[in-house]
Regions:
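Feature captures hydrophobic
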Residues: 2-147
Length: 147
């Protein structure tokens, strides 16, 4: 970090080193915060594809699950979790599907509610192999999906 001319990299490396040695508490910077308004105002595809960068590869080992997300007005997106990566798709030929309103999905991603609460309230339905879908969604660094 001390030898690179790139200020952003240097600052990131120094802040990370200080966090690791205990002289700086940077845990709040390592928490992903998803804003409900951003999910609701953006395209449907981004409401699902945002998860691709939140996958924890070690938790996704051995998973090969394709999930379609069906939202109101026939809007659809998909995510295929395989080889420890999440690949956005259009949802066609998915073996599992999740159906809910976009607002419910935004609540789950933003932490206002959890996946299990949405299922219990019957505002979200999973078709196909529920256990595989839940295990795949548990691989993401989103508190609302780990329930």
């Amino acid at each position: 970090a001390q030898r690179t001319p790139a200020a952003n990299i240097r600052n990131w490396c120094l802040a990370r080193a200080r966090h690791l040695d205990g002289s700086l508490d940077a845990t709040r910077f390592n928490t992903h915060r998803i804003n409900k308004r951003q999910i609701l105002s953006g395209p449907i595809s981004s409401a699902v594809s945002i998860l691709r960068v939140l996958l924890e590869p070690t938790r996704a080992e051995g998973i090969d699950t394709h999930i379609a997300f069906n939202f109101s007005q026939g809007q659809k997106a998909g995510l295929h979790i395989r080889n420890c990566v999440a690949v956005p798709t259009d949802g066609s030929s998915a073996t599992n599907s999740i159906s809910c309103e976009l607002a419910v999905w935004a609540d789950i991603l933003s932490g206002s509610t959890t996946l299990s609460q949405a299922i219990a309230a019957s505002v979200l339905q999973i078709d196909g192999n529920t256990a595989h879908a839940l295990r795949a969604l548990d691989c993401f660094d989103v508190a609302g999906l780990r329930s």
